[in-house]
Swiss-Prot record:
Residues 1-65 form a transit peptide. It comes from Solanum lycopersicum. It comes from the Eukaryota. GO terms for biological process: amino acid biosynthetic process; aromatic amino acid family biosynthetic process; chorismate biosynthetic process. This is Shikimate kinase, chloroplastic. Substrate binds at residues 136, 161, 183. PROSITE patterns: SHIKIMATE_KINASE (PS01128). Belongs to the shikimate kinase family.
Length: 300
């Protein structure tokens, strides 16, 4: 698929999967490069016209295309996730089992802001030999490198959501991708139509743990977390609770659910101490369970 654009102002960039995401704080280093399969590069192009009040919700014309490239470097080599040799081996073995059922279908991670979609997505892509893309980063790149928060402020949420849908549509035409979606991508039925072409996984994190993480990292990059007077944790938790009440049923549309509360119970540890590797393993397990169930239903 090729991207072609022809308007007065054009932005066209080749984006590799390690360039469209922010580097995570932790590192997972694999001793071997297993599942070395063709990666993807995505072209995101857009045309920007001077803003007019009457057309403030106009979409950027995104063109996303992908072509296989033999990229030898691991997308995780620049990160730093702590994982034992046993954890890495377990992830490797489970990924090999799941691949048989996945058959190249894309995996979409959904969930509230701050739930770990990007971090887990990068590890998941590495284990499966997939390419990883973050919808928010693709949109930011397409509109000239401004942040999601700035897009919300300058163009409004509707403008952002329209382009989010366009990105999901383009990605849904591809294969062997792990996609991290925005927290609000689930509210539009058309987005589910695109994501259901692959496998969707809901990362379900207790709101208290989310609020703690987000307030620690800061809320400036979160456009839907309005600055309010009072304790930052309390106001963040209140806003997250409101968002969850609105989106909860939408998240439940996912093919599989990964509950960090359940992981914590099984491993007898606090939710906040669950590692990205442990979450990724549970994602693989839940994907496998879903696909096995789906296969058995088809056979019947």
């Amino acid at each position: 698929m090729e991207a072609r654009v022809s308007q007065s102002l054009q932005l066209s960039s080749w984006i590799n999967s390690d360039k469209v995401v922010r580097k995570p704080s932790g590192l997972l280093r694999f001793s071997e490069k297993w599942n070395e399969k063709p990666r993807h590069r995505v072209v995101v192009s857009c045309h920007l016209q001077p803003r007019k009040a009457a057309h403030s919700d106009r979409r950027v014309q995104l063109k996303v295309s992908c072509s296989p490239q033999n990229v030898q470097a691991s997308v995780l080599e620049s990160g730093c996730f702590s994982a034992s040799i046993d954890e890495i081996e377990t992830l490797k073995n489970k990924a090999e089992e799941v691949e048989e059922y996945l058959d190249g279908r894309c995996v979409y991670l959904v969930g509230m802001m701050g739930c770990g979609k990007t971090t887990v997505g990068r590890i998941l892509a590495e284990t499966l030999g997939y390419s990883f893309f973050d919808c928010d980063r693709l949109i930011e790149q397409a509109v000239g490198g401004i942040t999601v928060a700035e897009i919300f402020e300058l163009r409004g949420e509707s403008f952002f959501r329209d382009n989010e849908t366009e990105v999901l549509h383009k990605l849904s035409l591809m294969h062997r991708l792990v996609v991290s979606t925005g927290g609000g991508a689930v509210v539009r039925p058309i987005n589910w139509r695109h994501m259901h072409k692959g496998i969707s996984v809901w990362l379900d994190v207790p709101l208290e743990a989310l609020a703690k993480r987000i307030t620690t990292e800061g809320t400036k990059s979160r456009p839907l977390l309005h600055e309010e007077s009072g304790d930052v944790y309390d106001t963040t938790l209140k806003r997250l609770t409101t968002l969850m009440e609105t989106r909860g049923e939408n998240y439940a549309n996912a093919s599989a659910r990964v509950s960090l509360e359940n992981i914590a119970l099984k491993r007898e540890k606090d939710v906040c101490h669950i590692t990205p590797a442990e979450i990724t393993l549970e994602v693989l397990i839940q994907i496998e369970n879903f696909l096995k169930t789906q296969k058995s239903v088809v056979v019947l």
